[in-house]
């Protein structure tokens, strides 16, 4: 980690009040930590947009396991990407619906492609990709 540098920020007083409320709601110790977190979040988002850096994402799927061949199709997709899908959690939500959470690691563009393939399988009721970082290069 590098040397800490102090700098000033100018902003509208109403925006600052809004920011201070956000800091309190999120439980940050101070403005500096909140600003550092915002910068990190922007950096991670930029890495995902560029698509070349390695990242990690969770793909959450909700589906009715009674839909013909759906479970098999999802399993086939997961096996096709066994090098990138590093973990899977399967939960029976009720007598019909299942939740799967898959942890996918790889280049950001590949993680997004795999998520799109899984979410796009006919019969998936809801799917969502949440993207994050491996932490490498993030200060």
From Swiss-Prot:
Alphabetical keyword list: DNA-binding, Metal-binding, Nickel, Transcription, Transcription regulation
Gene3D superfamilies: ACT-like. Chain A, domain 2 (3.30.70.1150), Met repressor-like (1.10.1220.10)
Pfam assignment, any one: NikR_C
One MF term in the entry's GO annotations: DNA binding
GO biological process: response to nickel cation
Record flagged with keyword Iron: no
Similarity section: Belongs to the transcriptional regulatory CopG/NikR family.
Protein name (record): Putative nickel-responsive regulator
Biological source species: Geobacter sp. (strain M21)
């Amino acid at each position: 980690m590098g040397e800490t540098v102090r700098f000033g920020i100018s902003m509208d007083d109403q925006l600052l009040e809004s920011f201070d409320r956000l800091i309190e709601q999120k439980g940050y110790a101070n403005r500096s930590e909140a600003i550092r977190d915002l910068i990190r979040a922007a950096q991670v988002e930029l890495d995902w947009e560029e698509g070349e850096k390695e990242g990690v994402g969770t793909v959450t799927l909700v589906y009715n396991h009674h839909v013909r061949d759906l479970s098999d199709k999802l399993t086939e997709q997961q096996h096709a990407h066994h090098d990138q899908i590093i973990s899977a959690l399967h939960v029976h939500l009720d007598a019909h619906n299942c939740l799967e959470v898959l942890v996918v690691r790889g280049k950001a563009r590949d993680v997004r492609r795999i998520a799109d393939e899984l979410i796009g399988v006919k019969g998936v009721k809801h799917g969502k990709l949440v993207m994050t970082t491996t932490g490498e290069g993030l200060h």
